Amino acid sequence: MSIGLSNIYSSDVVKHAKKVIVEINDKMPYTYGNNIINVKDVDYIVPVSYPLPQDVPPAPNEKDRMIAGHIAEYLKDGDCVQIGIGGIPNSVTEFLAEKKDLGIHTELLGDGLAKLAMRGVVNGSKKQFMKGKIVTSIVMGTDVVYDFVNKNPDVYVMSCSKCNDPYTVRKNKNQVSINTTLEVDLTGQACSEAIG
């Protein structure tokens, strides 16, 4: 069985858990990756049926669009992108429609990147690691991305511990990361998790 939309720690935890209780939602997309659990490893199954949360990205403001347009100029055909959460990163995807052969290796796959893949802008043909695959740990957005990933063999949901491991990320040449951050210190380190 597939873990579904998020493999932040789930596949790692299941290997070490004394009891495994899973909730099976008939509305959950089936995804491929290292997020597959053998039913023999499950102690309890709880069947449910409820709609998935719809995380509609905020409409970008003029400043977001201006910054996003500037950022998009730096991306080249064949780059492998990681795009984080937030208004500016979401806006960047709107400026990438004319690019070619983009790859995706990202922690979070949302509507914007899914739309690029559906348009053929993303094909992963220039990636060195998992060529042709869209690699992610979390799928979050609306039914646009949920429908896109459902039973899509081109999408690989990887455990966060591997997806975000610098050793894994560096396997793709021309990996470009676009993120919003909360703090930057004097040495250039950026913190996107918390302030303080």
Give the predicted meaning of each segment:
Residues 1-196:
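Conserved phosphate- and dinucleotide-binding cores of soluble alpha/beta proteins
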